[in-house]
């Protein structure tokens, strides 16, 4: 309202901006304005003037002219009075809103002690966390405050000075941005300039960076700012052991108002947990007088990744714009998480833990790690289980466990009386699924009833108090792999995958300061997220390889084995004679721990006489077959097999190594099979320019890098620039390659013309003959390099060519991007075909 009115009267455009996921992805119970209360503050004369000044052929003018150096500067300065007047116009409309609604909006709002000695200046969502922290500190007698920036441009020095208490002895400015090479960040420099020569001229001004990439900013970190006397430049929320800018924060503080209920839910992407929690927050917000807040935190995996839902409820307004680390209720919706993440450790004493699992007491003893048992027992945690997957299957909902577990939450949390909660959930289910028919609605009703009735309270054994800490489960790391990727996995990926990436110091990234990541780290994740995986039935297999062709994650692969390799295979690994090559054996192997269970392979399998060669079976029961896949990966690709069936066919292409494997794409993804196939055909000599979008997230979302390398260390070289410039970015990569190769070609031409060594001369000529053919130029390049290394001559061309040997061979340049980058959203390419 203020921005619209001020834009009309001030004749200048405004930008209302969010500061990231914390704002855009949060659900909050708010008070709304009634436009009837606000319409009379609109300046109708300003609207009439705006319309009269608008472009119109009845009174035409031209705007946006090209201006030459003689007048451009003067024309730009002519707008100064408009910017000078704008702060006053904005404050005028803020005053009108305040008068109508009882609010207190100013260009700069102060909150805190009247006699504050340390004041933070900040803007955006962090201000709510700062206010909550101020309440906590001032209750203990500390003299602190915050100035919240509401109008950033034009920046009013006068309004800022008026907002700061005269008692201030120190100012800390927080910026949520980083401008490398600058003397300070933008807000800090504005504050310094505004206070220069004012009554606060002698007050020291500190500058801090926070929240980059949605890094969480907590009350403990804000306390560290107020208690900071040492670092005039600092960072929050990280451990900077390289430039030593970070402030050390103490243990998590509980600064929320008394009576606030904090709940955290761990789910699996696409299992419905996030959607269920959105419904829960709306049910509570709409049907009680409680304030409610929900925020959803998840990794960059598509469906199948970890999701964490943070819900807060209370009688007081909720200002906590940070993640929950001190919870009253924690729910784990996926039993495989119990030994992967520290979940129960975030419960306060006496809190409630709900685990979705099929285990009875014997199963809990077997599967729960010692540290989980000990925490539950020693902190008086109320422990409950429910078999949501079993309930969902019995009802007909399959793997959608969200409604079952939502009902269990309402029963245990006791935020709303159980009967009322069930009634409200059923009403929400009717509204959501009513169009899909009574059967679907009834299934959800049954799930709601079952979730409330089938929760099992676990009597915690006394022996759990002394259970030993077993640590978190991490996938086995093959020490025989490439050192660069093993170091990356050990030092970074393992921590990040355990949801402990926030603990990594800056020094962990010094080798990756340019943004690079090693290829092939996704192979070390072994997430084990599938409920069912494909099981090969060799008697029904026609060896078509369609299953491997359509697999989005390269987890199912055909293997061609010699008789000796088949004999040395792990016990139980089946193989059959290869059709067309009777001296070879054929097998289909599946990576159980990388499969997402989409079933695309089983769906496409033609089988024999109506019987599939792939059937979906329980993952846990068949996890031992992972050894078959691991053995198959060690078997080298056989060129004679690829040649026999031709790499340009579905069958032949799948005997080549995929250089895109185990990505974070959705189960059943339609993009990755194409990209995977391209890497099988061109991957050893492939450049990829990737537009920002889905393909860049499954393609390289740190720390998981699915593009990998051959045993010789060759593979796709991948880079991402922006969303909109990918065509130019990829074209630039091609031009750079051409420029380098053309220069090297000139050197090879000299060798072909007058080299004394006949081997060098012949190799140089073969290189030139294949110069534009990617399929053959690589082999010719290898011959040329070998001849140069063996010739013993000292020609200048030799040294230059060997120094640049990686650039000699013809490469394959690709540009990947989605429909957005291609200006094709909603058209499926039809517009481009017709054009």
Question: Where does each model-flagged region fall?
Answer:
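Glycine-/acidic-rich phosphate or pyrophosphate-binding loops and their flanking alpha/beta elements
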Residues: 95-118, 131, 246-260, 523-524, ...
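Conserved thiamine diphosphate
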Residues: 1-20, 32, 44-47, 197-211, ...
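Conformationally flexible catalytic loops at phosphate/diphosphate-handling active centers
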Residues: 14-109, 470
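Active-site cofactor/cluster-binding pocket
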Residues: 154-159, 167-170, 174-185, 259-269, ...
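Thiamine diphosphate
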Residues: 1-9, 91-239, 249-349, 352-402, 671-687, 696-706, ...
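Structural signature of the thiamine diphosphate
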Residues: 1-49, 204, 214-250, 443-465
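Ferredoxin-type iron-sulfur electron-transfer modules and their immediate structural context
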Residues: 421, 434-595, 602-687, 691-814, ...
């Amino acid at each position: 309202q203020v921005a619209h009115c001020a834009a009309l009267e001030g004749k200048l455009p405004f930008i209302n901006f969010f500061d990231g996921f914390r704002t855009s992805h949060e659900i909050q119970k708010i008070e709304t304005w009634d436009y009837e209360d606000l319409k009379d503050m609109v300046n109708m004369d300003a609207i009439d003037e705006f319309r009269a000044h608008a472009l119109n052929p009845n009174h035409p003018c031209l705007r946006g002219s090209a201006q030459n150096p003689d007048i451009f500067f003067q024309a730009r300065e002519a707008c100064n009075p408009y910017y000078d007047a704008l702060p006053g116009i904005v404050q005028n409309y803020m005053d009108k809103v305040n008068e109508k609604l009882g609010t207190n909006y100013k260009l700069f709002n102060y909150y805190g002690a009247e006699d504050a000695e340390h004041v933070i200046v900040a803007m955006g969502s962090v201000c709510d966390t700062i206010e909550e922290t101020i309440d906590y500190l001032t209750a203990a007698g500390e003299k602190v405050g915050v100035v919240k920036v509401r109008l950033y441009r034009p920046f009013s020095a006068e309004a800022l000075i008026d907002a700061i208490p005269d008692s201030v002895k120190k100012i800390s400015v927080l910026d949520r941005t980083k401008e490398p090479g600058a003397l300070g960040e933008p807000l800090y420099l504005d504050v310094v300039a505004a206070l220069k020569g004012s009554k606060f001229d002698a007050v020291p001004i500190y500058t801090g960076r926070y929240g980059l990439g949605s890094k969480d900013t907590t009350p403990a970190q804000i306390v560290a700012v107020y208690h900071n006397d040492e670092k005039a430049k600092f960072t929050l929320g990280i451990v900077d052991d390289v430039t030593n800018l970070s402030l050390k924060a103490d243990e998590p503080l509980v600064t929320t108002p008394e009576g606030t209920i904090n709940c955290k839910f761990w789910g699996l992407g696409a299992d419905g947990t996030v959607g269920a929690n959105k419904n829960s927050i709306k049910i509570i917000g709409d049907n009680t007088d409680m304030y409610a807040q929900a925020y959803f935190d998840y990794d960059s995996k598509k469906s199948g990744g970890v999701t964490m839902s943070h819900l807060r409820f209370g009688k007081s307004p909720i200002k906590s714009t940070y993640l929950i680390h001190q919870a009253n209720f924690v729910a784990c919706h996926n039993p495989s998480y119990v030994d992967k993440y520290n979940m129960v450790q975030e419960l306060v004493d006496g809190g409630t833990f709900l685990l979705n699992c099929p285990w009875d007491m014997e199963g809990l003893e077997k599967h729960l790690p010692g540290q989980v048992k000990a925490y539950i027992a020693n902190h008086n945690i109320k422990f409950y289980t429910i078999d949501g997957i079993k309930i969902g299957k019995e009802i007909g909902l399959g793997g959608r466990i969200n409604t079952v577990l939502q009902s269990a939450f309402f029963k245990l949390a006791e935020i709303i009386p159980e009967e009322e909660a069930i009634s409200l959930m059923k009403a929400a289910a009717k509204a959501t699924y009513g169009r899909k028919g009574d059967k679907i609605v009834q299934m959800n009703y049954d799930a709601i009833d079952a979730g409330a009735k089938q929760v099992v309270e676990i009597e915690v054994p006394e022996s759990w108090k002394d259970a030993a800490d077993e640590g978190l489960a991490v996938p086995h790391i093959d020490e025989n792999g490439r050192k660069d990727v093993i170091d990356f996995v050990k030092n970074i990926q393992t921590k990040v995958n355990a949801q402990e990436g926030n603990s990594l110091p800056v020094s962990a990234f010094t080798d990756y300061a340019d943004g690079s990541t090693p290829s092939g780290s996704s192979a070390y994740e072994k997430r084990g997220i599938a409920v069912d995986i494909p099981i090969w039935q060799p008697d029904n297999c026609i060896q078509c390889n369609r299953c491997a062709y359509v697999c989005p994650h390269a987890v199912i692969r055909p293997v061609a084995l010699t008789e000796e390799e088949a004999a040395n295979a792990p016990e139980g690994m089946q193989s059959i004679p290869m059709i067309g090559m009777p001296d070879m054996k054929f097998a289909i192997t599946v990576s159980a721990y990388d499969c997402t269970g989409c079933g695309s392979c089983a769906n496409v399998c033609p089988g024999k006489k109506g019987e599939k060669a792939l059937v979906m079976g329980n993952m846990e029961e068949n996890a031992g077959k992972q050894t078959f896949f691991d053995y198959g990966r060690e078997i080298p690709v056989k060129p004679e097999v690829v040649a026999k069936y031709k790499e340009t066919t579905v069958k032949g292409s799948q005997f080549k190594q995929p250089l895109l494997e185990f990505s974070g794409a959705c189960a059943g993804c339609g993009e990755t099979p194409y990209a995977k196939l391209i890497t099988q055909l061109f991957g050893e000599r492939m450049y990829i320019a990737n537009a920002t979008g889905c393909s860049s997230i499954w393609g390289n979302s740190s720390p998981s890098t699915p593009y990998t390398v051959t045993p010789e260390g060759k593979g796709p070289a991948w880079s991402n620039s922006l969303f909109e410039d990918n065509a130019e970015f990829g074209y630039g990569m091609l031009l750079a390659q051409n420029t380098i190769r053309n220069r090297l070609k000139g050197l090879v031409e000299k060798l072909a013309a007058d080299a004394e060594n006949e081997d060098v001369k012949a190799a140089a000529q073969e290189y030139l003959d294949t110069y534009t053919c990617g399929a053959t130029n690589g082999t010719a390049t290898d011959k040329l390099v070998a001849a140069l290394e063996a010739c013993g001559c000292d020609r200048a061309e030799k040294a230059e060519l060997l120094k640049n040997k990686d650039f000699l061979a013809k490469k394959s340049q690709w540009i990947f991007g989605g429909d957005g980058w291609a200006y094709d959203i909603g058209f499926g390419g039809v517009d481009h075909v017709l054009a």
